[in-house]
Curated annotation (Swiss-Prot):
Its EC number is 2.8.1.4. This is tRNA sulfurtransferase. It comes from the Bacteria. The gene is thiI. The active site is at 458 (cysteine persulfide intermediate). It catalyses: [ThiI sulfur-carrier protein]-S-sulfanyl-L-cysteine + a uridine in tRNA + 2 reduced [2Fe-2S]-[ferredoxin] + ATP + H(+) = [ThiI sulfur-carrier protein]-L-cysteine + a 4-thiouridine in tRNA + 2 oxidized [2Fe-2S]-[ferredoxin] + AMP + diphosphate; [ThiS sulfur-carrier protein]-C-terminal Gly-Gly-AMP + S-sulfanyl-L-cysteinyl-[cysteine desulfurase] + AH2 = [ThiS sulfur-carrier protein]-C-terminal-Gly-aminoethanethioate + L-cysteinyl-[cysteine desulfurase] + A + AMP + 2 H(+). It comes from Shewanella sp. (strain MR-4).
Length: 484
């Protein structure tokens, strides 16, 4: 069994050297991701496609491979195929007939063929011959070229016939690391998750910068969002997570800054700090989730004033998106439930925030800050490899027990994603198992029986530890991590 990976059309339009570079990078990215599923995964690049072979002795990996390929930037779509050899057009028909006989019975159908290589026939001739045979020697209702109930998709390359058994839509965009790195300001809400995702999809290695306005609970939640985005869409490359202790800045704003200017000043301080951090990391652009007119600091006038605080390029991919469209995209990429349960820290709220800030007035207010404030904040920032989140959580989960055995009155919660849980169902004799995906746990845990203890389970133990710490920070102490 094989997958044929089709390149995103924008890649196909590039010049030959650029197209070759992009295709090589996509091949490497696919290999990096699939090797984590199975070491025997085979990936082979051609000019206009990439082949992925599922090991013959492990057909059950097909679903896992397909799910991972669907989340790798740079792919238009993927087709899962079964491979056959043929000697003639009639031989093609004879091999297609037993496969599709039952599938097209009582239905309309059509045959579509894509062909590469030198043959004594063309694609249309194969479509007519195979379609005519299926129409005559099966119980199909007939051929319908527009909107058929079943489409028989065939691909021919040399003397090989590939019958398409499944088509999987890809992300599109460019392969990861074909564009330069960016630093995304992430709060864990609806907007910042989507803006981060859009740059991952565009092929930029996206690092994360979190401004902690107070509370370990918020930082844990944001790390879950960042880890989910990286693990799902950007796992082929290492990225950094930067946590900036911003409480001192908030304290000085509340104490020294004019009430109406607080929101704009806070954003300018964030941009200055992020720019300094980005420069240290060799990054030339900052990404934010700001959308025009969404809040008072996001008017054109205020955004212009905010941008004047640094020479660093500030990118706002959501600038013209409606809030509902952002939420819909958030739901599609799997961060909606995180955003819904994210704690809000509104320490800097102006009574009458200005929507038309004056640069000179804002700069005058900023002279009231301590001279070394930004320097201190940047020095205190904690930078970690996003893959180290699990190890970091291990040192912090002092209130949470990790268990290998299950006692009475304990319930196991399988927090894996639905596809992963379906692939490898967790079954423990005599034990109650609830299935709540990690991205829904924060909103559903409060409804569970508080008299019972809950053991969180996931494959590698990373997300279960994050979720356990998050729940403990919310005040739940009837939770442990299950590692059989």
């Amino acid at each position: 069994m094989k997958f044929i990976v089709k390149l995103y059309p924008e890649i196909m339009m590039k010049s030959k050297p650029v197209r070759m570079r992009f295709t090589k990078m996509l091949e490497t990215n696919i290999r990096n991701v699939l090797k984590k599923v199975d070491e025997d995964a085979k990936v082979q690049r051609q000019w206009d496609r990439i082949w992925v072979k599922v090991p013959n002795d492990k057909p059950e990996l097909a679903q896992a491979f397909g799910e991972r390929l669907a989340c790798i930037p740079g792919i238009a779509h993927v087709v899962q195929v079964d491979e056959y050899s043929f000697t003639s057009v009639d031989d093609i028909y004879q091999q297609v007939l037993p496969v599709y006989r039952d599938q097209i019975a009582g239905k309309t159908f059509c045959v579509r063929v894509k062909r590469t290589g030198s043959h004594d026939f063309n694609s249309i001739e194969v479509e007519r011959y195979v379609g005519g045979g299926l129409n005559q020697f099966t119980d199909a209702i007939g051929v319908r070229l527009k909107n058929p109930e079943v489409t028989v998709n065939l691909e021919i390359e040399g003397d090989k016939l590939y019958m398409v058994t499944k088509r999987i839509e890809g992300l599109g965009g460019f392969p990861m690391a074909t564009q330069e790195d960016v630093l995304s300001l992430i709060s864990g809400g609806f907007d910042s998750g989507v803006s981060s995702y859009q740059f991952i999809k565009k092929g930029a290695r996206t690092h994360y910068c979190f401004f902690n306005l107070g509370g370990a609970q918020h930082e844990i939640g944001v790390k879950q969002v960042a880890y989910h985005l990286w693990k799902t869409y950007g796992e082929s490359h290492k990225v950094k997570f930067v946590s900036v202790p911003f409480e001192p800045v908030v304290a000085e704003i509340l104490e020294k800054i004019d009430n109406g200017q607080m929101g704009v000043v806070l954003k300018r301080m964030m941009m200055r700090t992020a720019a300094r951090i980005a420069e240290r990391m060799g990054i030339q652009a900052i990404v934010t989730g700001e959308s025009l007119g969404q809040v008072s600091s996001q008017t054109l006038t205020n955004l212009n004033v905010i941008d004047r605080c640094t020479d660093m390029l500030i990118l706002r991919p959501l600038i013209a998106m409606d809030k509902q469209d952002i939420i819909n995209e958030c739901r599609r990429i799997g961060t909606e439930d995180f955003a819904k349960s994210m704690p809000e820290y509104c320490g800097v709220i102006s009574q009458k925030p200005t929507v038309k800030a004056v640069l000179a007035k804002v700069e005058a207010e900023e002279t009231k800050f301590s001279e070394d404030l930004i320097d201190r904040i940047v020095e205190q920032a904690v930078v970690i490899d996003i893959r180290e989140i699990a190890e970091q959580m291990n040192t912090r989960i002092t209130e949470t027990e990790t268990v290998v055995a299950i006692d009475t009155n304990e319930v196991v919660i399988d927090i894996r994603a639905p596809e992963e849980e379906e692939n490898k169902p967790l079954e423990i004799e005599g034990v109650e198992i609830k299935r709540i995906p990690f991205f829904k746990l924060a909103t559903q845990f409060a409804d569970l029986d508080k008299q019972k203890t809950y053991l969180l389970y996931c494959e590698r133990g990373v997300m279960s530890k994050l979720q356990a710490l998050y729940l403990i920070e919310q005040g739940y102490h009837n939770v442990k991590v299950y590692r059989p």
